[in-house]
Amino acid sequence: MMILVVDIIKGMQTQTAECLIIGEITCKHMIVVLNKIDLLPPEKRGVMIEKMTKRMKNTLANTVFKDAPVVSISAKSGGDSDLNSSSVGIEELIETLKQYAYVPTRGTSEPFLFAVDHCFSIRGQGTVMTGTVLQGSVNVNDAIEIPSMQVTKKVKTMQMFRQPVEQASQGDRLGICVTQFDPKLLERGLVCCPGYITNIHAAIISAQKIRYFKSSVKSKMKFHISVGYETVMAKVSVFGLMENDKSCEKSDDRGDSFSFQQIYKYQDELLSDESDSTKQIEKELPLKQYVLLEFEKPILASSRSLVIGSKLDIDINSNSCRIAFWGKMLERIVDKNYSTAVLPKLKVYKDKCKTGIVDRIKNANEVIGKDIFKKETNIQLFVGLKVNLSTGEEGVIDGAFGQSGKINIRIPGGLKDTTISQINQGSKKKGKNVAVQDDGNDTGPVKFTVAFKRYAYDPEKRMIQL
């Protein structure tokens, strides 16, 4: 559960909206607190509180917090306030908290992960790390690792709310005492069971675009990526699993799984299924969307970490949302040489299409094509690829014809009589404007296309026709 505190005088500000977005990503329950009601004119206070409450309800109507309660308070009334108490509405807030508080589902089966928010020493005892257990459990005498320091320590003692405990699990606020560790080396960070967290150089995440982010999330752009306590710059590459791909495994999952065995389509940008723009409608929305993150420097991250991408260099006073996308970390890439060791395994294709013109006929089953390749192109790479003529015939590239970039195209089913006539007429009219006959038959040049896929990370740049 989260509490969203709003200055009733200023209303929703950019940072308030961003807190709301982060809240939607991280939890499903919220209480809105309208603070500083003591600053409202006494004679208009009731009306203005009601007006702001209604405005907040309208703001939350299209979010997961549409039923969130709104409580108005004065946490600390000013000296000139007409309010008799130093604070107003706190009791109502406490009662609201009691009403909406719930015990979340907890588990202990996952590896231990602990978020440290403070570190200090106690003379004669050791170093205490205070924080929250994010997942799993820990016991006294367990071995724990401080991955940022690559140091393993033994849990000496533990306390919760000043009371000694032998065991703690997910959700607990905890103090862990270890020996022979300088607290100055760790202020905030992660602690885990040995070997659970390592430095990563890249990652693949599930991805969802934030609908309030006005700009595009385009491949090759750089964003600020927040994972745990760290925020670093990373280059993004967007790709998706298309529903019509033959390799697509039918699943109700919306992006929480990833397989290097699947074939994915490269995307110029991250799409949103909540957008109604014309630009959006023209594009096919993938069944699932992913982002490859290539970090400028290594970061520590656990499996299934929450990842948030932002443009923090946008002026906070510009009244624009800076949070661009979010997702879950599905694949951590630890190899420093991932571009050659890992990425070639990633089957992300780009649709390619080349168009040329039939130059002339060799025989009823062969034609010469031109205006598709440069003379320095290695045409041998394209041999065997299927070709479609604009007149309907299908063919195959047999090889190069001469040294000027022309190619031999074999038509297994043979050319139609109308196609032969059209090619011959086009050959006679080289250099002249092509016309359309009175009977409607096109006498222009016969074109052909070669459609294929190329894997973006294939070092050999091979072409594939599925």
Write out the residue ranges for each language-model feature:
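Residue-level signature of catalytic and energy-coupling elements of molecular machines
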Residues: I3, G23, N35, M56, ...
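Canonical P-loop GTPase G-domain recognition
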Residues: L39-S121
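Conserved nucleotide-binding/hydrolysis micro-motifs of P-loop NTPases
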Residues: I9-M12, K36-P41, A75-D80, Q135, ...
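Short acidic, glycine/serine/threonine-rich loops at helix termini
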Residues: T16-A17, P41-V47, S81-S87, V128, ...
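Conserved Switch II/interswitch segment of TRAFAC-class P-loop GTPases
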Residues: M1-L20, E24-E50
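C-terminal effector/interaction modules appended to NTPase cores
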Residues: G124-L466
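Long, charged, alpha-helical interaction scaffolds
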Residues: M12, G23-I25, H29, V47-M48, ...
